[in-house]
Amino acid sequence: MALTDPLGDLLTRIRNGQRARKDSVLSPASKLRARVLDVLQREGYIRGYSEEDLAGHSGLRIELKYFEGQPAIQHVARVSKPGRRVYSGSKDLPRVRNGLGITIVSTPRGVLSDAEAREQNVGGEVLAEVF
């Protein structure tokens, strides 16, 4: 069966892995997934990720992060979905938990956090929110 929302699948794998207290989770690889993981790593929500070979296909092993036994990611949600795309200008980017969380945005300059997008004065598709 074809995957209609690869990014939603990635976020669900991370959410489920943290609920199950896993050290790492596997996900099929794509450029978009890797860029989103770059943002999560820069912002300190995951320890890191590496590319692996999974039965002839490339995959990503995501190292999950915990703080005092609690997952670093308390909430992760897809904002722009295949059936309803959500776009925002740089001045209208949503703040998650009054700035405590991040919004992941796909911009012409790449996948950025909301703070980076505001700093570079670019808007784009609001992919997900994390805190």
Curated annotation (Swiss-Prot):
Gene3D superfamilies: 3.30.1370.30, 3.30.1490.10. GO terms for biological process: translation. SUPFAM superfamilies: Ribosomal protein S8. PROSITE patterns: RIBOSOMAL_S8. PANTHER family: 40S RIBOSOMAL PROTEIN S15A. Part of the 30S ribosomal subunit. Contacts proteins S5 and S12. This is Small ribosomal subunit protein uS8. The gene is rpsH.
